[in-house]
Amino acid sequence: MAAMALTASLAGALAGTASAAQQAQPSPSQKDTPAARAVAAADQAVDSGLDSLVNSSQEQYERRLVTPWVKDLYSVSYERSYRGLPVVGGDAVVLADGTGKVRALQSASSVRIDVSTQASVSAKDAESTSRAKLVSVDKVESSRLVVRLKDDKPVLAWETVLSGRTKTAPSKLHVFVDARTGAFVDSYDEVVAGTGNSKWNGPGPVTIDTTNSGSTYTLRDPVRTGLSCADYSTGTVFSKSSDSWGTGNPTSKETGCVDLMFAAQKQWDMLSQWLGRNGVSGNGRSFPAKVGLSDLNAYWDGSSVTIGRNSAGEWIAGIDVVAHEYGHAIDSNTPGGTSGQESGLGEATGDIFGALTEAFANEPAPYDTPDYTVGEVINLQGRGPIRNMYNPPAVNNDPACYSSAIPGTEVHAAAGPLNHWFYLLAEGTSPGGGKPNSSTCNGTSLTGVGVQNAGKIFYGGMLLKTSSMSYKKYRTATLSSAKSLDATCDLFNKTKAAWDGISVPAQTADPTCTPSGQNNDFSMSLSPSSGTVQQGASVTTTVGTTVTTGNAQSVTLTASGLPAGVSASFNPATVQSGQSSVLTLTATANAAPGASTIVVKGQGASLSHTVDYALNVGGTQPGNDPPDIDVANVQAHLTQFNTIASQNGGHRRAGSAGYTQSLAYVKGKLQAAGYTVTEQNCTSCTYPSNNLIADWPGGPADQTVMFGAHLDGVSAGPGINDNGSGSATLLENALVLAQKNPTMTKHVRFAWWTDEEQGLNGSEFYVNQLSSAQRSAIKGYYNFDMVGSTNGGYFINNVNSTTAAPLKAYWTSLNLAPEENTEGQGRSDDYSFQQAGIPTSGYAAGASARKTSAQATKWGGTANAAYDPCYHSSCDTTNNINATVLNRSADGVAYAVWKQAVGGETPAQDFSVAVSPSAGSAAPGGSTSATVNTATVSGAAQTVALSVSGAPAGVTATLSPTSVQSGSSSALSVQVGASTAPGTYTLTVTGSGTVSHTSTYSLTVTGGGSCTPRQLVTNGGFESGSSPWSATAGQTLETLSNLNANSGYAEKSYDLSQFAGQTVTLKFTGTEDQSLQTSFVVDDVTVQVS
């Protein structure tokens, strides 16, 4: 059993209460962290289509990787999709800081895609074309339909991944074949080959980290997860009974592994201490290695490193070789990967990491000294180094200067200019100290920044890397990196001079830099970034600006790309960066319906930025009559689901690529229509994947009506009736609701569930995450599963309930005489809500049960045959849909939406205002902050002027901005003067628009000579883990064990008044003295002051 002692020891305030309970509590939210602020800023930039990013109704960005860097900077990378298909070559990356400012961004391409997604060539035919690109193919790893975007030209293509061999080396080749014509498009190889130093490291004996288990030691790093070294022939990690490794013989594989582990561990440490990177992968992992390849080579294959030999049979696991190969791994695990890189960039990246690791290890002669040559001591074929970074022509006459010939140059030779740039940046042209001189291509003399700073600048450029990276894009990326690292512009200017020194010309995307305090720049955002306007009406969005560097400046706003019949106005048209403006888009009665992209430009003193607004012009006015849903549109969605399934193994099972692309298709449609869309990751699902939740703005949130359908299918087939029919029906209803934009009397939420086929897991996960208040807010849930069965019936869940009334009323109006859905009871997602006490109903047309004679007489169809003869089968395609049943189901959903949640009159504009958190404290001389949130309650969004009153003498409260569009927020900052009297004060925040609303903030000013009786929560959150607390003296309050198990908290108090003016620590000690484990929860340490 476990025991736990609570000890109050000399080491808090005046009187403390500690509570402990043996029950789990959730951890506090981590939303307001530097990383979260950076990610939120990056997400907003992507959502707004900032500068070269694309905001289109057909295209989406999905966040993939967040990499912390130095100086509170974060690299946030995104992959792009088009109508549910991955866009290879369309990725982007945003560099943002912990204060929530966008510092730089780079996009692989800013071209908007408009291609057919229907393949004319089969995946099998594309595979045959792809196989011809390798000498031998061991395995077809995967095949998928993508949009290949290269040189700003989009092509629908099959991407086939093959493992095998070229004429000289192993290969993992990605081949792209035009899916319309069958022509080869391009390819790239994950396997990157190189060579290097096999000299032993020293002076000996060197120390390496190994793993010990009992009496066995293995060459597996216990700290650097994933790093190990194995015999290439057997694949077995080296192990032995002692922790003494290697023979000193360079032909010994074990010695080669010692050299590899030493070099890889030094590189890991360099990444952490110099560059701020968490391991080779960036998330605390490395990769395994093998020694013993018979080739005169070494390579990275996408998941491991393999070391070969030199002509003397010595294993080439020296520092610069090992660091070079793991440099390829870093290249693969930074934004953009290595796909489509210009020739030479990958090899030079490996060489740069080799030079950095040599410099970090700083070994003396005769070992591998820091020298900026590659493989200088291995003498691979008796000719010395294989590359020279300060003088590339010294080896094989490699080029030192960039030219238009570089993209077509052999990859190792093409590394010359980038290697030369790195040396010029690190050391300059005449470094002295025994280091070699290096000449520039333009005859200038340069001073270096040092190898560590050069490494930071280059690595920062890698964090802005995209696919199809080029020398010219690296120039822009490293200039942005240098600018972010150094406000004085010294690093920026030297980085620029080094690029000029190898003849890489200036680019239009290059940033500019002036000394600290003068380098003024800003960013822009839109909230929301898309919307629908009816003919004869208007829609608004808030254009936000943020100071990213330097001081605020005047920004003039303009809009372009307006469709015929739509005009734009800004209020105000010019703002100071840091302020916002309201953009109003007004459509005439004759404005052409359809989608378009409005480009909003902000022109500063010398720089400009753009954001994109996705506008949809609707062709009809909102009204109270339920609309007729066009079944052809529903069938079009089903066709898209069918296409997605055929391109991804024939199904859309939860967790599969088919499901992911289906979700992306639905999500893209909803975002373009103006919905607030959320993906919820179902961690408890059989196949972990995402639910999709879409909220239509308007209507009271505490009066919510939900409409749901499961999006997943079984692996046996495309799942078009089960349940593409329900999913497509809801999607089209959601789009029509957005187009009509009627007055909402209730809030409407749509949901597409994952993992239903494995046991209603997605919807159950969602319901279980709801608080009691959130459950109470849902006044009804409607489920739609298999609503297009070919031999279908007309079934309603809980047909005689109040919730079912609108569904029943519509089908009854068609003389369909609907029946209870007995077959589907407990078998679809409505059951999850029913179990939580939420009223439910829904439509179904039947599954594998058989239609009775009476039903066939009433509804038509075949008696004694299954409602759906293709239930859970491969034939559940678009041919397995009864359009009449589907149409009646879709129209019935619209009838229910309108009857349950739509009003008849144009709504009065109204909004709400709330402060979060609603209370805070600060000492005299200190400060605190909160967020003022607004929301549109009814009608259209409106401009809300914000003010704050009630601040006592000495307290200054400010809002930024002081005017927002309802639905946006403002920052409340409270500064407490040094002479402010302690006490609790109420600040009132007032929002004024068509009406006025207020919200309050309770400010507690602490300190002072007097004492107000009150209870202070000194540990209001929940913590897990341990802290290094120590007691110099103390008193045990109580000892607890698992015998004291309690469903609530056991509260203990102690009078600490005797320690007035001193510091007191409460210590909680847990001791395991038997195998039975016991958990304790300690929470809410409070102080009662009197």
Swiss-Prot record:
Protein name listed in UniProt: Leupeptin-inactivating enzyme 2
Cleavable signal peptide: 1-20
Cross-referenced CDD domains: M28_SGAP_like (cd03876), M4_TLP (cd09597)
UniProt-listed Pfam families: FTP, Peptidase_M28, Peptidase_M4, Peptidase_M4_C
First-listed, main subcellular location of the protein, grouped into a coarse class: secreted
Record PANTHER family: BACILLOLYSIN (PTHR33794:SF1)
Enzyme Commission (EC) number: 3.4.24.-
Role played: A leucine-specific metalloprotease that plays a role in controlling the amount of leupeptin during colony development. Degrades leupeptin into three components, acetyl-leucine, leucine and argininal.
Positions of the UniProt region annotated as Disordered: 17-36, 513-535
Disulphide bridges, residue numbers: C870-C875
Enzyme class: hydrolase
Residues with site note (Transition state stabilizer): Y871
Binding site for Zn(2+) 1: H710, D722, D785
GO cellular component term, pick one: extracellular region
Subcellular location: Secreted
Top-rank taxon, per record: Bacteria
Binding site for Zn(2+) 2: D722, E757, H872
Keywords: Disulfide bond, Hydrolase, Metal-binding, Metalloprotease, Protease, Secreted, Signal, Zinc
GO molecular function: aminopeptidase activity; metal ion binding; metalloendopeptidase activity; metallopeptidase activity
Family: Belongs to the peptidase M28 family. M28A subfamily.
Active site (UniProt): E756 (proton acceptor)
Polar residues bias locations: 513-530
Quaternary organization: Monomer.
PROSITE patterns: ZINC_PROTEASE
Co-factor binding details: Binds 2 Zn(2+) ions per subunit.
